[in-house]
Amino acid sequence: MIERYTLPEMGKIWTDTYKLQTWLDVEIAVCEAQAELGYIPQAAVDEIKAKAKFDPQRVLEIEAEVRHDVIAFLTNVNEYVGDAGRYIHLGLTSSDVLDTALALQLVASLDLILEQLEKLIQAIRYQAQQHRYTVMVGRSHGIHAEPITFGFKLAGWLAEVLRNRDRLVRVAQSIAVGKISGAVGTYANIDPKVEAIACQKLGLEPDTASTQVISRDRHAEYVQQLALLAASLERFAVEIRNLQRTDVLEVEEYFSKGQKGSSAMPHKRNPIRSERLTGMARLVRGHAVAALENVALWHERDISHSSVERVAFPDCCILTHFMLKETTDLVKNLLVYPENMKRNMNVYGGVIFSQKVLLALVEKGMNREDAYRVVQGSAHQAWNTEGGNFEELVRADAQVTALLSAEEIDQCFDPQQHLTNLAEIYSRLDI
């Protein structure tokens, strides 16, 4: 991923140096396990741990000749270790190292993602608490529907990110597996106990039934969950973009001092953060498809997945982490305009209260079809008339006033009637 969208702590996990260090960590854990079981001398392990290191540039030089990254790495490590190096990689295949080390990278990445997700949860919950009863219009199909509150809208966001957190916690367990089982997974040249001990040292569980690789359904699930999270963040971003439209302007991204929105139009204050999040979600979703394609490897393994994963895993983890940070900052600094919300809600003189009028008439004994016709007629007249006022038309309709008193009509147009049960929802989310 390009540096522009890479936060340092996540970018570090996907550097060559970090990757090679995880390879070395796996090799040393295996050596320690073999020594504990009496397969190799403890003195050799001590020497390996004291001398083992690598030079990323030297590894690349060797790989240019041998055309195999793990062999290049082992060759470089042995240049430092000397004779004790013969015990490194004993009974292993390259994927024992690659897949186990990859699990360490994916777990470390998910730790950062979950940490940032917690910050987003706190930011959304705080804003929801501040706007529990900030009344605005709810929209369906992009059209005014009925009153809601901005806190209620944010409650939906909060519930969604909490579900994302639950899914990521589950996938963290699924991906935290290693394999030290040899060329086709049968432990033909290594004791399964070595795998168990080595994985324990690394904080992993042994894979249940690996081949030459860990089955890619685990990795596909991992990327799917990141894609789901990215899709949620995109949903929030798209909502902000729509609410920031000039003719809506109910919320707005924070516009910092000195910031400029257009090279041509000085007045512009564009929702660029939300737009950027929308684009990033497309990238993560694209990688989710590629991760699914990687599941169907040939027999006990082919290498078709490798080139995909060298791009997809770093990109997905780095982008998702960046998106979370951007969304958190966006929510924390979001500008909210309650007066504009109230203004928009009252367009056409209260057509959004049409259902309340309909139900009130039905409760008074009017046939539902007749009530619908009466209310729709006034609503559409208000809608189609410049400066139309639905409430005034309702109050002037003899069919309505024959059944509803002025006080009962007042109640129909009271926004608070729509908010009476919000406390139940808020209590579920600690808002």
Curated annotation (Swiss-Prot):
Pfam families: ADSL_C (PF10397), Lyase_1 (PF00206). Disulfide bonds: none annotated. One of its GO terms (biological process) is 'de novo' AMP biosynthetic process. N(6)-(1,2-dicarboxyethyl)-AMP binds at residues 4-5, 67-69, 93-94, 212, 263, 268-270, 307-311. CDD domains: Adenylsuccinate_lyase_1. One of its GO terms (molecular function) is (S)-2-(5-amino-1-(5-phospho-D-ribosyl)imidazole-4-carboxamido) succinate lyase (fumarate-forming) activity. Keywords: Lyase, Purine biosynthesis. It is an enzyme of class 4 (lyase). It catalyses: N(6)-(1,2-dicarboxyethyl)-AMP = fumarate + AMP; (2S)-2-[5-amino-1-(5-phospho-beta-D-ribosyl)imidazole-4-carboxamido]succinate = 5-amino-1-(5-phospho-beta-D-ribosyl)imidazole-4-carboxamide + fumarate. It comes from the Bacteria. Gene3D superfamilies: Fumarase/aspartase (C-terminal domain), Fumarase/aspartase (Central domain), Fumarase/aspartase (N-terminal domain). Pathway: Purine metabolism; AMP biosynthesis via de novo pathway; AMP from IMP: step 2/2; Purine metabolism; IMP biosynthesis via de novo pathway; 5-amino-1-(5-phospho-D-ribosyl)imidazole-4-carboxamide from 5-amino-1-(5-phospho-D-ribosyl)imidazole-4-carboxylate: step 2/2. Its EC number is 4.3.2.2. The active site is at H141, S262. Catalyzes two reactions in de novo purine nucleotide biosynthesis. Catalyzes the breakdown of 5-aminoimidazole- (N-succinylocarboxamide) ribotide (SAICAR or 2-[5-amino-1-(5-phospho-beta-D-ribosyl)imidazole-4-carboxamido]succinate) to 5-aminoimidazole-4-carboxamide ribotide (AICAR or 5-amino-1-(5-phospho-beta-D-ribosyl)imidazole-4-carboxamide) and fumarate, and of adenylosuccinate (ADS or N(6)-(1,2-dicarboxyethyl)-AMP) to adenosine monophosphate (AMP) and fumarate. Belongs to the lyase 1 family. Adenylosuccinate lyase subfamily. Homooligomer. Residues from neighboring subunits contribute catalytic and substrate-binding residues to each active site. This is Adenylosuccinate lyase. The lineage of its organism: Bacteria, Bacillati, Cyanobacteriota, Cyanophyceae, Synechococcales.
